[in-house]
């Protein structure tokens, strides 16, 4: 993919992060988002694992039949990236691709602990900041990201 295309994707992700913010986020919100993601994946015939955490506490976790422990490892690795940067894991993936420097080299991080690949999106409270994250694993990185974005947009538009 060309650098200009990657730059456009990067800008779009920043817009998502800026606009897809919550006024509050409860355990019930986590449940509704998680169920929406699972039902959407089922309807579309996709096998995923999903995790929603707030303030370091897991509020929702579900692994569809056909997913494995490897999906859980990917979730944790993506979550560490969001926790470190307060940006989506897809944004960090694209920024690494633009720079041409692998994420792990740039930040001197262990690749077995951190995964800058799409699928983990920060839960941000307006005028507060990042308080958690929504993570999907099982699909290509951009599709994992898109599934989370669809769920957040749907939830915020209710």
From Swiss-Prot:
UniProt record similarity statement: Belongs to the UPF0303 family.
Lineage: superkingdom: Bacteria
Name assigned to this protein: UPF0303 protein BcerKBAB4_3106
NCBIfam families: PRK02487.1-1 (NF002692), PRK02487.1-5 (NF002696)
Organism, as annotated: Bacillus mycoides (strain KBAB4) (Bacillus weihenstephanensis)
């Amino acid at each position: 993919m060309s650098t200009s295309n990657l730059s456009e994707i990067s800008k779009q992700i920043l817009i998502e992060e800026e606009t897809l913010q919550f006024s509050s986020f409860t355990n019930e919100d986590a449940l509704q988002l998680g169920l929406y993601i699972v039902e959407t994946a089922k309807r579309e015939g996709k096998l995923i694992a999903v995790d929603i955490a707030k303030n370091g506490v897991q509020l929702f976790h579900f692994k569809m039949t056909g997913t494995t422990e490897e999906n859980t490892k990917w979730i944790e690795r993506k979550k560490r990236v969001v926790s470190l940067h307060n940006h989506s894991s897809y944004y960090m993936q694209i920024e690494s691709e633009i720079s041409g420097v692998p994420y792990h080299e740039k930040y001197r991080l262990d690749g077995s602990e951190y995964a800058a690949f799409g699928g983990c999106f920060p839960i941000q409270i307006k005028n507060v900041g990042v308080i958690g994250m929504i993570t999907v694993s099982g699909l290509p990185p951009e599709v994992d990201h898109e599934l989370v974005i669809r769920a957040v947009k749907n939830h915020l538009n209710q």
